[in-house]
Amino acid sequence: MLNKTYTYPTYEAGRHLALKKIQGSIVNLNLIRLKEFADYSDFPDIAPETTISGYEAFMSYIQLAKPFVEQTGGEILLVGKGGRFLIGPENEQWDICMLIKQKSVSDFFAFEQNPDYMKITGHRSASILDSRLLPLEMLSF
């Protein structure tokens, strides 16, 4: 049996997030597993002239996405090299871990639906083998 991979949120997952009615900021925890080589076969208009690694394609995506994140009041808090869990499944590892802060869920959705942002998401798709995205609601303590 093949392991299921995840690269984009489902409609139901987005609906669930919207219905939570989170007030204030969220921080999105992103776990990314990269392809060895980027696959631009579905995105020939933005493909580089030579083959590049999944890492290089993903870093291009981050550089191009950063202004869109910031336009909606968001901030890239961390882009870090992943690896194996200290606590968690021993056979599971992630290449890149990110924390992205957004002012609100609606600002996050506005960022994701920006037509100009959508033009660069091919770099993300070309680079990612699997991913997880967990929106975190800020708690007071």
Located regions from the model:
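Short S/T/G/P-rich N-terminal loop/turn motif that feeds into the first structured element of a domain
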Residues: 1-96, 103, 107, 137-141
